[in-house]
């Protein structure tokens, strides 16, 4: 799709999520409830959500920058540290009293036994939306491509999504979207939309398990 003699410079905009992995083993059942007691022996963290996109692009040699919203919580600090480790240039905005998204997966003897999430969804103020849009507008000409990585956590509001696409298109910069939710209208005029089958089926209200529905679904998209 893209041919470059140099490393492409890509702007990723979206929801940063911290993935935490707890590793351990179990040899007994809790006396409080019929559940295993996991003795944790190690843990590690990685970038999730839009962070996973950043990590993959970085490993492929692209020059990546990110625009997102975090807070002053411990999860946000860990995410910033992981981005710094990858030498990713960041444009991060702060929403006070917000808990950044963290997904914790618990493993016992290499098998996942539990996942629990800690987060609250962002409700961006108009003033913060304007700051984000202005930042993107001031930087957009530097990039070869823009990726919107929407995990439904609030960074990609309808206003921000439409503004990103409009600004990028005005400079003939392609916008690729990994969508979330059923409101695909907010991604109108993007270059490429990449829903999975379940997401497309729910957004279009078309059963994609029926083979004859696939072509009408593509036309509707």
How would you name each of these model-derived features?
Residues 31-38, 109-122, 195-202:
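Gly-rich Lys/Arg/Thr-decorated short loops/hinges at beta-loop-alpha junctions or inter-strand turns
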